[in-house]
From Swiss-Prot:
Function, as annotated: NDH-1 shuttles electrons from NADH, via FMN and iron-sulfur (Fe-S) centers, to quinones in the respiratory chain. The immediate electron acceptor for the enzyme in this species is believed to be ubiquinone. Couples the redox reaction to proton translocation (for every two electrons transferred, four hydrogen ions are translocated across the cytoplasmic membrane), and thus conserves the redox energy in a proton gradient.
A single MF term (Gene Ontology): quinone binding
InterPro entries in UniProt: NADH_UbQ_OxRdtase_chain4L/K, NUOK/Mnh_C1-like
Subunit composition and interactions: NDH-1 is composed of 14 different subunits. Subunits NuoA, H, J, K, L, M, N constitute the membrane sector of the complex.
Top EC class of this enzyme: translocase
Protein name, per record: NADH-quinone oxidoreductase subunit K
One Gene Ontology cellular component: NADH dehydrogenase complex
The organism's taxonomic lineage, starting at the top: Bacteria, Pseudomonadati, Pseudomonadota, Alphaproteobacteria, Hyphomicrobiales
Principal location listed in the UniProt entry: membrane
Length: 104
């Protein structure tokens, strides 16, 4: 009588998160923090896909790879936020237009 959570449920959640992340990048091009959070949502959706397929197929490779992706995503977020803090201290703004002005 209980509801069984299958692979399609996980894939649906991952697709929704991926879509939200993609929309966040395309609809909000002015705020760097929102873009960074949207990239993290996309990586989270990829991790959900990796873990769900890994569990469905009974193979641990996808789960190990998801841990690797989580580690790289955490490092990317930390480095990105550190760069934004330094940029804000130097320029007083973190708008995308100001960051584009840094191109040589």
């Amino acid at each position: 009588m209980g509801m069984d959570i299958g692979l399609s449920h996980y894939l649906t959640v991952a697709a929704i998160l991926f879509t939200l992340g993609t929309l966040g990048i395309f609809l909000n091009r002015k705020n760097v923090i929102v873009i960074l959070m949207s990239v993290e949502l996309i990586l989270l959706a990829v991790n959900i896909n990796l873990v769900s397929f890994s569990a469905f197929l009974g193979n641990l490779t996808g789960q190990v790879f998801a841990l690797l992706v989580l580690t790289v995503a955490a490092a990317e977020a930390a480095i990105g936020l550190a760069i934004l803090v330094v940029f804000y201290r130097n320029r007083g703004s973190i708008a995308v237009e100001d960051i584009n002005a840094m191109k040589g």
